């Protein structure tokens, strides 16, 4: 109906018809937007809760402290002070008081509010971070191994006192006259490339860059099959003679010390006198009538003092022996091997022997593996076979010394009536001898002083 009217009145009213449809299109649009906006900003509640959330944020002004005055701007970066910052000054606290004090001061451009005037320019001079030096561009190295390892390798190679080919040749010839420095061989072994490095070297044909020396070293290494294992064999051979000598000397010292201690009649007499002296002192107590005493009780003699506190029981023992059995004063001469034996740890000796035995097994493994090396290892294989045969004989000799030494050490502990470790027996006896000799020397000096004093008094008596 309205359309007909509109079409009939087209010539009279052309514009009015379009506005009503536009209003209809615009009128429905305004209502929808508000609900979606409210749903996005607020949770389930309608607009009133939104107003509640926005209202609480501003806290009451009285509790909030006034912010500290800003320090003047600096012209450069300064070294930071890594303190734990406080953001609020509690009323009545030191910081509250300082804040109020700062409010009363005038602020100048070159000063920070403080009890004293601080010059910003002076602080900048002293605590400036300074400009960081720009790193110098380093020339690229050949990507054989990582930069750190390459640098360490080059430094160590420069420290070697022998050319690498000569070192490897000496190892292959098992010739200690050309190279007998164990440390140099160990340093070289520590420079060995990984399997990945070795694989890369065998196929590398590019530019060597600044790693010329390193590249030559690695190329030299890959020429010999299992060169690292062969160098370890040579290192073992260099140390072997010294180790065998040390073990033999140590085991002989243990056997000699055990024999000397158990057969020394003077030591037995000393121990008997100490036992008698102790039983006299402990008469009528639970410690009296002893048939023996723990070995470490020997050291207590120097701690037991007489009434005048000038003489110890050790001094008294030496004094009695000097007057009644002076031949016992040098009992320590019977124990010539004691001091060297006291430096030996039987457990360490056993571990060294075990390490040598395991080392020989590795040598045998390399001997077997080198059979397929071809001519390059022919001389090495022959010399290694001879060395293994000789080394096994020497190790058997050491083992023949070790088992009796261990048995003698156990028998020595039984000799003193307790299950002492061998190291404790030797250390205690050695300490006792030193205390005994010191007490005797002090007694001699005291006797000389008393003799001089008596002579002086006699002279004074004559002059009267």
Swiss-Prot record:
Annotated GO biological process: actin nucleation; barbed-end actin filament capping
Compositionally biased tracts (Pro residues): 14-70
Membership in a protein family: Belongs to the formin-like family. Class-II subfamily.
Protein name: Formin-like protein 19
GO molecular function per UniProt: actin binding
Pfam families hit by this protein: FH2
FH2 domain sequence ranges: 68-462
Gene3D superfamilies with a match to the protein in the record: Formin, FH2 domain
Region described as Disordered: spans on this chain: 1-74
PANTHER family documented for this protein: FORMIN-J (PTHR45733), FORMIN-LIKE PROTEIN 15A-RELATED (PTHR45733:SF10)
Source organism of the structure: Arabidopsis thaliana
InterPro entries reported for this sequence: FH2_Formin, FH2_Formin_sf, Formin_homology_domain
Upper classification of the organism: Eukaryota, Viridiplantae, Streptophyta, Embryophyta, Tracheophyta
